[in-house]
């Protein structure tokens, strides 16, 4: 069975019922346990919620409870991820450190990264399996 890593935007779109996530949202609910997010996405969500840059219609505690109920795992950034991160090329058009951590996590954990960010596609040659939504 395929294993997926949702980036921060994909997860947020799922929670706000964005049409880009309609089919995938059904899959998340059907294939419980095959979807995860990185700890970096969790950190980014905390920041976005605290500073009012994103509205999910729930507080952070409710968000975590929902992740647990959907069996969406949280993957920590370990040495395997750090090794991948250190081998990624320095791309001048993509310097966001959180994105690069998420990409490294997907590669290290052999998960398909789901994102709406077209820039992620440039890492396919580095071992990323990418599903653009």
Where are the model-predicted features located?
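Short, well-structured N-terminal submotif of metal-dependent ribonuclease cores
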Residues: 1-38, 53-65, 133
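Alpha-helix capping/helix-boundary segments
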Residues: 10-11, 41, 81, 102, ...
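Donor nucleotide-sugar recognition loop
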Residues: 91-98
């Amino acid at each position: 069975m395929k294993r997926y890593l949702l980036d921060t935007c994909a997860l947020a779109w799922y929670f706000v019922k964005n049409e880009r996530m309609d089919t995938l949202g059904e899959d998340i609910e059907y294939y419980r346990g095959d979807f995860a997010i990185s700890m970096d996405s969790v950190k980014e969500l905390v920041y976005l919620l605290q500073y009012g840059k994103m509205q999910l219609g729930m507080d952070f505690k409710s968000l975590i409870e929902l992740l647990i109920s959907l069996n969406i795992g949280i993957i920590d950034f370990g040495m395997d991820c750090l090794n991948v991160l250190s081998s990624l090329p320095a791309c001048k058009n993509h310097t966001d450190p959180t994105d690069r951590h998420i990409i490294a996590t997907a590669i290290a954990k052999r998960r398909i990264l789901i994102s709406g960010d077209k820039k992620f596609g440039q890492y396919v040659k580095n071992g990323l399996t990418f599903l653009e939504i």
